[in-house]
Amino acid sequence: MKSRYLVFFLPLIVAKYTSAETVQPFHSPEESVNSQFYLPPPPGNDDPAYRYDKEAYFKGYAIKGSPRWKQAAEDADVSVENIARIFSPVVGAKINPKDTPETWNMLKNLLTMGGYYATASAKKYYMRTRPFVLFNHSTCRPEDENTLRKNGSYPSGHTAYGTLLALVLSEARPERAQELARRGWEFGQSRVICGAHWQSDVDAGRYVGAVEFARLQTIPAFQKSLAKVREELNDKNNLLSKEDHPKLNY
């Protein structure tokens, strides 16, 4: 993947980070596995998968205003503060810059690796129109729409990030793997419900997240960081009890 793809996505990265702290990525954009190469093209208009895409979109749009729609809106915010709030009860431990600084930075780093670098080449190449644009509807987060219109729909970066994050946190806290896998799946599906992505975008994003997970396993800096994350999330002082957080048994 060429470095110019980073320029294309840099405004998105900056907009999502609310902390001024800089986190060094585990690899460069050029060292990402090229998603344009390994992903098939998104479904064409005459493809049965495209009919399924439309069915899934309208199924999500039909529950607009419901609790699940509101969850999709919450999932759309990939700021580190919001992701920590979502995944802390699922992993069963605190996630904040004071008690778990390595985990906090890992959340940021995985967004860059999975949400942006890993998806960039396919997004740039296909520049697929998003469903809310095609149908002239609002998404669950209208404030994101101007940015999304300029960003290819296929594959879903949010989904790649959520999948990657669930897998990495499962490495650190394997006893919470089933809960993390479920929440990671829902995080991706939220993009269809929100109206920001087609189902095939999300399906592809899940695979991109898995590919990036495999890529990270080969990088010593990631392994070193993961060891610290594992230590933080299993520190008895950072573990959540049922009394601390009623959602622990999610």
UniProtKB/Swiss-Prot annotation:
Signal peptide feature range: 1-20
GO cellular component: outer membrane-bounded periplasmic space
Subcellular location: Periplasm
Domain of life: Bacteria
Cross-referenced Gene3D superfamilies: Phosphatidic acid phosphatase type 2/haloperoxidase
Record-annotated membrane-spanning stretches: none
Protein keywords: Hydrolase, Periplasm, Signal
InterPro entries in alphabetical order: Acid_Pase_classA_bac (IPR001011), Acid_Pase_classA_bac_CS (IPR018296), P_Acid_Pase_2/haloperoxi_sf (IPR036938), P_Acid_Pase_2/haloperoxidase (IPR000326)
Family annotation (PROSITE patterns): ACID_PHOSPH_CL_A
Chief localization: periplasm
SMART domains per the UniProt record, alphabetical: acidPPc (SM00014)
Subunit-level organization: Homodimer.
Entry similarity comment: Belongs to the class A bacterial acid phosphatase family.
Name the record gives this protein: Non-specific acid phosphatase
Annotated organism of origin: Salmonella typhimurium (strain LT2 / SGSC1412 / ATCC 700720)
